[in-house]
């Protein structure tokens, strides 16, 4: 019998994966198939390209303007040509924006670095199944569209267009896409949005996403820190309210557990394909999770929040005290069928960096 167990395990493993291909962590099941359509790539930013798609002439560069139906398969941005981590590195003052099928407001609007799981641009490398960073930024989210797509880099920091700005922005980009004859009716459009808020979580939950319509949630990255203290709690619950629920049908009991860890985040960083953690800023943590096999479908609406559980009265009381205010930021990724709710208004560039460390003086002190 003991000799049959390995064979039985191998058979079951093979049978399961034949029915459940893991596209994000293995080769696509149709890699050998020569499909119709063609693969194309659009370049921008580098000196060989027209000046209209370089930061020397504009602060809003259209890095790709595509006709459909098609699907974006990869987007790459090179590091700035004069990147100096001491004097300047990419931060939240440059945004990635993507518009589908002629829409006037974007479906993707995030600080570039946060989109790539590099909040505030403080990482030297990130390694996940769907985005990575190492001397460049790459994303592999499939992004289908029917009529047209426009991919932009928008700089809204203090510098004007010109050579100085060009020297500190990504110096090269390409967008790879594959042309298609048509898209199935249930194909969603890729969306991503960024939020940041400081709040008393004992009194109010942090809202990472609130949207109406039909779609599925496929991932997020989150940062948390306390501007007053060198610690932050991980006892918050992550709640997914689907289709108007008053009690979330998907609720993870513990911030670290929802990202695949337990008993607090680990003492050292861990970057796995679908989940990961690393230190953030001076006294915080950052984590990411991609929902590949466990994407959260919704048909009418979805609200995603971070807050304490209903019975956690002690935590709620403790984190209603001003010294325990928490700062959260998040980038969420989802697919949406049809029009989506407007994305939250982007904060001014000067307000996107993590809030500075602050001293807290209790009321009543004589100074």
What kind of region is each of these model predictions?
Residues 6-19:
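Bacterial N-terminal signal peptides
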Residues 1-4:
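Positively charged n-region of N-terminal signal peptides that target proteins for export
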Residues 23-367:
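Beta-strand-centric surfaces of beta-sandwich/beta-rich domains
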């Amino acid at each position: 019998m003991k000799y049959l167990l390995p064979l039985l395990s191998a058979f079951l493993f093979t049978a399961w994966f034949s029915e459940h291909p893991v596209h994000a962590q293995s080769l696509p099941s149709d890699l050998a198939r020569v499909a119709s359509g063609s693969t194309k790539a659009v370049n921008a930013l580098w000196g060989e390209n027209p000046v209209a798609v370089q930061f020397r002439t504009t602060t809003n560069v259209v890095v790709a303007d595509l006709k459909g139906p098609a699907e974006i398969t990869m987007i790459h941005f090179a590091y700035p040509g004069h990147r100096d981590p001491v004097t300047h590195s990419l931060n939240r003052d440059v945004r990635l924006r993507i518009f589908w099928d002629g829409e006037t407001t974007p479906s993707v609007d995030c600080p570039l670095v946060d989109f790539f799981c590099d909040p505030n641009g403080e990482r030297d490398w990130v390694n996940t199944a769907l985005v990575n960073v190492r001397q460049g930024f790459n994303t592999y989210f499939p992004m289908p569209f029917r009529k047209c797509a426009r991919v932009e880099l928008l700089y809204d920091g203090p510098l004007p267009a010109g050579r100085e700005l060009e020297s500190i922005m990504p110096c090269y980009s390409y967008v790879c896409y594959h042309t298609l004859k048509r898209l199935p009716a249930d194909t969603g459009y890729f969306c991503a949005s960024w939020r940041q808020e400081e709040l008393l979580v004992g009194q109010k939950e942090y809202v990472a996403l609130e949207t109406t319509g039909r779609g599925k949630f496929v991932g997020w990255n989150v940062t948390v820190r306390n501007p007053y203290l060198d610690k932050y709690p991980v006892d918050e619950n992550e709640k997914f309210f689907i289709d108007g629920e008053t009690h979330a049908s998907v609720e993870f009991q513990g911030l670290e557990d929802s990202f695949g860890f337990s008993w607090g985040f680990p003492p050292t960083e861990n970057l796995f394909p679908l989940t990961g953690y690393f230190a953030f800023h001076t006294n915080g943590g950052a984590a990411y999770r991609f929902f590949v096999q466990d994407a959260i479908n919704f048909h009418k609406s979805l609200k995603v929040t971070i807050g304490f559980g209903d019975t956690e009265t002690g935590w709620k009381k403790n984190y209603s005290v001003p010294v325990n205010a928490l700062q959260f930021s998040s980038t969420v990724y989802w697919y949406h069928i049809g029009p989506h709710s407007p994305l939250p208004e982007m904060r001014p560039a000067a307000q996107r960096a993590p809030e500075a460390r602050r001293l807290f003086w209790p009321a009543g002190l004589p100074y």
